[in-house]
Structure formats: structure tokens, C-alpha cells
Amino acid sequence: MDLFPIIMSVFAAIIGLVIGYVSVSAKMKSSKEAAELTLLNAEQEATNLRGQAEREADLIVKEAKRETSSLKKEALLEAKEEARKYREQVDAEFKSERQELKQIESRLTERASTLDRKDDNLSNKEKALEQKEQSLSDKSKHIDAREEQVAELEKQKAAELERVASLSQTEARDIILTQTEDKLSKEIATRIRDAEQDIKERSDKVAKNILVQAMQRIAGDYVAEQTNSTVHLPDDSMKGRIIGREGRNIRTFESLTGIDVIIDDTPEVVTLSGFDPIRREIARMTMEALLKDGRIHPARIEELVEKNRLEIDNRIREYGEAAAYEIGAPNLHPDLMKIMGRLQFRTSYGQNVLRHSIEVAKLSGIIAAELGENANLARRAGFLHDIGKSIDREVEGSHVEIGTELARKYKEHPVVVNTIASHHGDVEAESVIAVIVAAADALSAARPGARSESLESYIKRLQDLEEIANSFKGVKNSFALQAGREIRIMVQPDKIKDDKITILAHDVREKIENNLEYPGNIKVTVIREMRAVDYAK
């Protein structure tokens, strides 16, 4: 028996069993995996369905909330709209009622005004009736009085006729002439008075025209003098040099010039204060020369002060000559020119006296020419009318008396002498030119802005201070400083000893208190300086 086929059959059966087992196992495994996959898919689908259901539920909730919110808003808007309509209805009703009230009030006001007007009309009519009644009563009384006057006149005429009937022709003519003369005398007096008034008005008009023409032809512009001068410094370091060691430079400067030096916080400026324009000009020139030279010490200050005093004298002469040529009087005596030049540094109520004199001279010449008088002589008289003011501080007497004596001394024309003497009414004017100059003087002084009373009073007080100090024996110089709050007195050392200085200060203080009126306090300073000078050769 061939075993090979059996073995092959068995082997084939075994292989078939194995293959069958493997197939069955594979099928079983495949079925399990399919079942698991199906389960997973089912779970996934369930999860998806649950998520979808939840989302749909959320959407339904949100939609419900939106619908609820929309319903609330609509309800709120409807409520607001209802409230607005109700408010508008109430406002309209209130406005209508208020308009009706205004109309009622307006009608009442108009009715009240109408009643007031009617009341006023009735009052006016009542007053008019009362006035008419009073007027009729007055007229009735006037008529009664006139009737009485007429009756009285009739009686007088009857008596007059009875008297005339017994007169002769000559007597009747004399009576008629007397009555006519009495009637005409009043008319004649009226005509004479009218003629005099007409002449006066015409003369005033002519005089005004002459004065207006004269004033329009004069251009006399000048500024009221001040009491301060400023000097500009190159830099603020110069202030210390001006003061000097222990203040010796500034003390020397003030003592020699009589001018107060004010050094304050104002940058690069030094102020020179003093009421005397000549002293102030000398001080200004000296200060500028010191700043330019650079050497600032007491000896140099003294040297420059003396030099500038001489320079001022020359300038005074030049001022006088220029003024004389300006008004057409070149033949004026040289000494009178110099004296007139001093008026450049003199003020009267703040008005520069030299410019005032030139203005008066020009006005006088123009007015004299209009009136047919000697214009040259009028200009000369007007120019010299205040010449006494140039030296009235050195010579006793008023400026009128001093000016009159100067004019006589230098043999001026008698008309000029009388003009100077009479321009303030001290003596009677003897010529038309004297009257013209007085009028021109008043015109120049009265021009608005020409003079300042307060400045003149201030300067007069300072002058009085110095005059009181100078009235004591042994006083060399005195200077009013600090706007009149200090009087500094320089004494002669050979006449006033040290033990007398205190007594002198006390006496000056007492005299100031008894003779002057001033605000605040016045410091009295007396300085006695002994100086010995020698030269080494």
C-alpha cells in the first residue's frame, strides 16, 4: 500500500484544517473588528447627535432671549412714545392757556393805559380850564385897571387943556420943545450907547484879529524845564569809581557843584538832581568829562568844575548873541547880550525865560507892525522886558526894578526903559509899545502848557532854603539837596570854629521852621573844611 498518498491526504487534511482554522479565526477576528468599529461609529454618531442637540438648544435659548429683549425694547419705546405724546399734549395745553393769559393781561394793560390817558386828558383839560379862567380873571382886572388909567388920563388931559388955554404962544412953544427934547434925549442916549458898543465890538474884533495873526506867525515851541539830568555810563562798574573810597569822590562832586548825585539800581545811569539849571549843567558837563577821561578823584573833579564854569560863561554869551540876532537886535550892548544869555538857565513857572523873551519880542514886533508902530523898537523892548530876572538872585530888588536900572545904565531908549518898568503895572505905561509888550507878555505866559505853578513853587522853596542859610555870617556856600530835604552849608573855616558849627545848625533849623512851610523833615548839615595847599618846586 502506497503510504504516500495517504500521507499526502492526511497532510492535505491537516493543511485544510489549518487553513480552515485560520480562515475561521480570521473571519471571527474580522467580525469582532467590524463590531467594534460599528460600536465606535455608533458612539461617535451619538456624540455628534448630542452636540448638535445641545447647539440647537442653545440657539433656541438665544433666539428666545433675543425675542424677549426685543419685546422689552419695543414695550419701552412704546411707553416713551406715549409719555412724549402726553407731555407734548400737556405742553400744548399749558402753552395755549399761557397765551390766553398773556392776551388777557395785554388787554388789561391796554385798558389800564387807555384809562390813564383818559385821566391825563381830563386833568389837562381841567388845568387848561383853570388857566383860561385865571387868564380871563387877569384880563378882567387888567381891563378894569386900564379903564381907571384912561379915566385918570382924561382928567389930566382936561386939566392940561384948561392950563394950555390960559398960556401964550411962546409959553406953549417952550413946553412943546421941552417935551420933545425929553422924548428925544432918551433916543439920543440909546443911539450913543449903541454907537459906543459898536465901536467897542469892532475894536475888540480888530484887536483879536491882530493877536491871532501874531500868534499864528510865532512858532515858539519849548518844553518846561526839569530838575533832573541823566548821564549814561559805559557800564555799572563806573558807579563805584564815581562814589570813590569812603564816598570822597561823590562828596567832593556834590560840594563843588551843589548838585545831588543819585546812584540807584537803574542800570548804566547816574541822575543829577538840582533846581539851579546852571549848576546842573556844570555838573552834567563835569560828570561826562570824568567818564570820558577815566581819572576820577577829588583834584580832577575840582579842576573840571572850574573849567566847565568858564565854558558855561562862554556858552551864556553865545546864547545871548544868538537870541539878539534872532529877534533882529544885533546892535545890543555886549554886556546886555551876556546878561540875556543867563536867562537860558532861568525858568519862570517852568517856562524858559530866554525863550519867553524871544517869543514876547516877536509877538510885540508883529502887533506893533499891525498898529503902525515902530516894530524894531517893540521887539527890542519885548526882548529886554524880563532882563532883571537874570541877576535878581545877586542884586536886591524886584526883577522890574533891576531891569529898569540895567536899561538906564546901558542907555537904552526911554520907551524901552518905560516898557520894562511898566510891564507888570508898577508904573504907568507912557507909550503904545509899552502896552503892546505887556499884552505880548501876557499872551506868552498864558499860553496853555507854557508854565507850571507847582514846579515854580518847588524851586522857590529851594531858593528860600539857600537864602536862609546864606543869611548867616561866615557861610560860604549853601546847597539845597535831596529835593529840598537837606540843606548843606559850607562855612568859612577862619570865621566859624568847630564849636560854633552845632550852634549854626541849630539857628538855621530854627529859622527854617519859623519862615518856611515844607513837607516832612529838612536835614541841616554844616561842613567846615580846612585845606592847606602848597607846591613843591
From Swiss-Prot:
Record field: transmembrane: 4-24
One GO BP annotation of this record: mRNA catabolic process
Keyword tags: Cell membrane, Endonuclease, Hydrolase, Membrane, Nuclease, RNA-binding, Transmembrane, Transmembrane helix
Listed EC numbers: 3.1.-.-
Membrane topology of this protein: Single-pass membrane protein
Keyword match ATP-binding: no
Molecular function (Gene Ontology), one example: RNA binding
Localization in the cell: Cell membrane
Xref: PROSITE patterns: HD, KH_TYPE_1
Chain spans, region Disordered: 112-148
All copies of domain KH, residue ranges: 227-287
Role noted for this protein: Endoribonuclease that initiates mRNA decay.
Designated name of the protein: Ribonuclease Y
Organism: Streptococcus sanguinis (strain SK36)
